[in-house]
Amino acid sequence: MAQKKQRVYKSPIGAIPKIVNNFESKTLNQKIFYDIIGEEETQLILCHGIAGTGKTYVSIYKALQDVLRRGTGYDKLIIINPTVDVGNEDKFGYLPGELDKKIQQYNESTFTILDKIIGKAKAGKMIQEGKIEIGVLNFLRGTNLENCYVILDEAQNVSPMQIKTIMTRISHDCKMIIQGDLSQCDKYKTNGVTNYEKSGFYDVWNRLKGIEGVNHMEFNRDDCIRHPLVKRILKTYEDEHEIKL
């Protein structure tokens, strides 16, 4: 039987390099998320979703489209990850090696996505040209974020004060995407159980409901595009530890 052809959603009019010309969504919610990011009136997007839903892939894809398209007002993409090891507190200062190696250690998945979307050579060139910056929260203090996309990934491991600090850096022509999975709070646990209500991401998700210029997007277990077994595994954890936003 012939395989069903994937529907292609074309991006808005503009001169876009062929490397990121068309976005192909794998679920309806991926398409909705992509469209929300593209809304001109939306400056801050909060996205919650379990692992495997494609939230990071979609946000990076759309950001790259707008950075590479002329006349959008976005000159670069900044991708930030909190420096938290699984099951541990913030440990960036104790990592071995130089700064760039430390940053790379916490952003391996980011580099993988960049390579998948635009290729390793193009990604490396954009990093060298300053069109892509990959960093950590610790080095954002005092920085004004303008004419750029900012993606804060794994935001479930960010404190309320840290997330407030980064949001108040938003300046002109800055679009910020804060995304995370509250079921994977490595920093906030009580007796080994995730205490997601202490997370800055949980705080800001509820605090900014109904605020003009802010939009919320939530993926669910059905959006997981990994092996069907992963969905069944996730369901057992959801039944035991339900996330209530």
Language-model region placement:
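Conserved helicase motor core of SF1/SF2 NTP-dependent helicases
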Residues: 2-36, 40-152, 156-245
